Amino acid sequence: MRSKGYRRGTRYLFSQDHRKHGVAHVSKYLEKYEIGDMVDILVNPAMMKGMPHKYYHGRTGRVYDVKPRSLNVALYKRVRGKYVIKKIIVRIEHVRKSRCSEESQKRILMAAEMARDAESRGVVLAPSKRKIEGPRKAVEVSLDNNQPIEVGYEPHVVIF
């Protein structure tokens, strides 16, 4: 029989890096979170309070409520073939701001800047959707210095 403890099977999952053990730094507590922020849940095993279940370690969710020492995070969990929204309460030590939407945020800011420039110049801006790369272009091989080689198979010969 295996025990059904809350932290079972986390010997390596919750292990800290070399010389990174102990309490979280002050900067962790000074980080500001707002409703709508995307956060990565990364369990800090040195802090037992507000620790989420091992299932949520490494998952990304959205903050829907901010408390003085904790966050309420909503994320999707697959349950029997469908995705259910799970709402969990996690202390600040176990989360960090996610970088999952950095690229799209940059693209949005760049598009807004281009729209302002176009408006100031009085030019209509073309749609800035990303284009799919598509297949490679056709290439012609000249036969001047390239002798054609017949490609085929050799019959199987038993040596012994």
UniProtKB/Swiss-Prot annotation:
Keyword Ribosomal protein in record: yes
Similarity annotation: Belongs to the eukaryotic ribosomal protein eL21 family.
Keywords in alphabetical order: Ribonucleoprotein, Ribosomal protein
GO biological process, any: translation
GO cellular component, one term: ribosome
GO molecular function, one term: structural constituent of ribosome
Record InterPro entries: Ribosomal_eL21, Ribosomal_eL21_CS, Ribosomal_eL21_sf, Translation_prot_SH3-like_sf
Domain of life: Eukaryota
Gene: RPL21
Record-given protein name: Large ribosomal subunit protein eL21
